[in-house]
Amino acid sequence: MAEKHDLLDDIIDITNNWGAVSKPVETVMNGISFDPETAPQWDPSKYKERPRPNSVRCLSVASKDPKACTKCQDVCPVNAISITETALTVNESCRKCGLCAAVCPTEAFLIQKLMPKTLYNSIAKQAASHDHVYITCTRALGRIPKENEIVLPCVGALSKELWFSLFMEYDNISVYLPLGVCDRCRTTTGEEAYTDAISYAEELTGAACGLEVDEKALDHEYSRAYKRSQFLGQVARTGTSLVAGHNAAIKGAQAVAQRIQNHTQRVNELTRSLEQAVGVQNSQHHRRMLTQRRELVMAALQKWPEPAKQMKSELPTCDMSKCTMCGDCTEACVLHAIELDRDGKIQIEPAYCVGCGVCARVCKEGALEMHPTDGSALVVPDPHAEEIERERAEVRKLKQQGKKVLDSSLKALGDTFGEDSSSKK
């Protein structure tokens, strides 16, 4: 339902156009003096980057089995990725689409522009300040993007975990792709990649991703809450009249930045809480590693844990009667989620395990098997929330105690008055 337009909204509309009305000559001169040669030019290569493979994080390299995990090769539209027992490589034919980085469970591909946390912050910033934010690709847009248009080499470069984290927080995210744009694209695996990722996130969150196919229908308006916060911040800070011809204040931008900063702090605190609970290192002195995508998912679940039970994954379980303590499984796990403890037993930390199944694949004795599980282990209690709840419980307790004392005092006072009245009679 549309929000009711009130007097403050009218004043904001007037203020936004006041500069052009009060300085007509300057406005006209700016239009006349516009030089297209010095203006920024559309450059699609700016949004593309060849992934840098990190062989240390590759499951197939760590397990010395090139077929242990082939998700990146399966999604690559030009077969540009090679995996051997010693190295993960990307050759010159790479289209820089980013699909490999989106599907790799251990984030073995580094693309600076497409790092999960960086992408999340970029999209969240625009979702918090605009009525709509649009995820699109270089082929679909073909021009310099507006502020609330997030341009990717391919929409499939956004992982399913990132879609999930965004849908849990925002309901104004859409994809902009004109009809037929994917049909003629040489990144032939991109359409299936992004439809699968979005469907996964929609099913878990109950959200609905918007789809826009007409460029004329794109909405670049700031959200009502953002504009009001921005305007009121200007009035409070400068003390000017409501229709003074000044630049818009940054109050709204500060509020958005604070929201992003709070999310980052929540992710960092979650990581620290997890490390305190299970230890930074395992018994082999290897540092356990959380992928950025896993951090974002866990941060969302910490705030809204309901979808965790619907998540489908797998965890390894070990039959110790078959285990020879060879350590092959621990060597294959690049995130160090599995360890052989000091008592000679296999231990798995579910929060760090991505359910790839490579540990079970390399176990020659068949001691490890993968079993279905949900995402309950990814819900880490918020220590601050627990503290706040304890404080609230204490306040409720004190209120009840105070009420009992007050009731007792009033009853005693009533009895006293009753006795006085009886004695006077």
Give the location of each predicted region.
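Flanking helices and flexible, charged tails adjoining ferredoxin-like Fe-S electron-transfer domains
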Residues: 1-50, 56, 60-65, 102-206, ...
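Basic (Lys/Arg-enriched) interaction patch that binds polyanionic ligands
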Residues: 87-106, 226-235
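C-terminal compact regulatory domains
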Residues: 297-299
